[in-house]
């Protein structure tokens, strides 16, 4: 059945992820992707320190490739290592960092708040850190720290929020660290973008019409000025003739 194949494939991916998580913990393991290609199986490993994943002369990569082929049954596995550009935005890496700080004896509140500041400083929209276990005494408890905006339910919380989990063994018992991060480039389904108003552009035809109107008005004004000048000349001529007639009569 197809459903059974999906379950088997998902179980295999989970086992591979757990193996790489344990093997590459010191390299800052940040997750993996498995891609089936015509030439075999491509396994993309994301790590904070790719050099430790590859090893001297490619020794670690060859050992991991043989394990994936023999123990997990991958067909011609090819490993590609990619560096995590911003480790603060990778929840799996940050969960490991929290576990390491707790193992060194730091207080869980101080660890959680410092981690949240680093994640938000990297540009995340929101972050949630959950630490569960015997953190205060002999009884188990849960401490949750939230900053910014983060989706808690529905399909966007699964598709848009990245999650990471780690465990650490302390004297009182095992602590679980759960980190959820909403990346800075996340666009929510209900987000609305308000566009700026558009400026109206006057067409060339309208400009020509306005210029023609202006020219006609100038022509009319020139004709009026000429008529006024002609009237002034007539008045001067009449005044001169009347003055001459007055002289003759005298």
Curated annotation (Swiss-Prot):
Coiled-coil zones: none
GO terms under biological process: translation
Regions crossing the membrane: none
Superkingdom of source: Archaea
MF-aspect GO terms: rRNA binding; structural constituent of ribosome
Keywords: Ribonucleoprotein, Ribosomal protein, RNA-binding, rRNA-binding
Cross-referenced NCBIfam families: PRK04191.1, uS3_euk_arch
Name of the molecule in the record: Small ribosomal subunit protein uS3
Organism: Methanobrevibacter smithii (strain ATCC 35061 / DSM 861 / OCM 144 / PS)
Encoding gene (name): rps3
